[in-house]
Amino acid sequence: MSSHFRSFGSRSLYGVVLGLSALTLPGCGDHKAASQVESAPKVMLLNGDDQPLREDFNRDQGFVRLMVVVDPICPECLRGLADMGDDVLAKLPKEARIKVYVVHEPVIGGSDKDIPAAAELLHTTLAHHYWNPTGDFGRQMSQVLGLLHGSSPVFAWDIYMIYPPNAVWSGKGPPQPSYLMHQLPGLDNQKFPPWDGKLFATKVSDILAISDPKN
């Protein structure tokens, strides 16, 4: 897929990364060295069929599922992950029926070696981490979500999504989430609310409460 994606926005674009050129990429600031993680998470390579993410997603039916797409060195993405850890995951009860998937893409030059430090911000070992070096997942998710700046597609990254327990990944692309927040300038903020960790936490709690079989 290619080239009709464009770049715009207040973040500076750092250039072409593995075929992501001409995407709408609001870029991030300079990467600062992060602390080493004592126990590095397992990072799975995402293939052209979105495996093993697709298999994991469908296996986890019955759970509320959170999916995050980031570059592991983007400062705004790292802030989003930190908010996710502090405002959402750290405050959930231990028995919460929830799964977390984080797809990392090299939008501004991040690599799989940067994932452990980014993963540490979530304060949990329960998240599944995937590395998508081609950026194909971001293009695919952009189409699924209908991310547009005017008439131009916006590459999907720095996005935070909630899927209900009954969501099934049956088509070629991922299913539509029930809720999405983002940190991408230029999107319709009425349709796609900008990232707010505390509000996202409220939405997660609401969906957990609705789906709790004891309620």
Q: Could you say what each language-model-derived stretch is?
A:
Residues F155-N215:
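Thiol-/selenol-based redox modules, centered on thioredoxin-like
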Residues P72-E76, E105-G110, P133-G138, A167-W169:
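Solvent-exposed loop/turn segments at secondary-structure junctions
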Residues M1-S10:
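N-terminal secretory signal peptides that target proteins for export/translocation
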Residues A119-P153:
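Short, internal strand/loop/helix patches
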Residues L78-E120:
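Structural microenvironment flanking redox-active thiols in thiol-disulfide oxidoreductases
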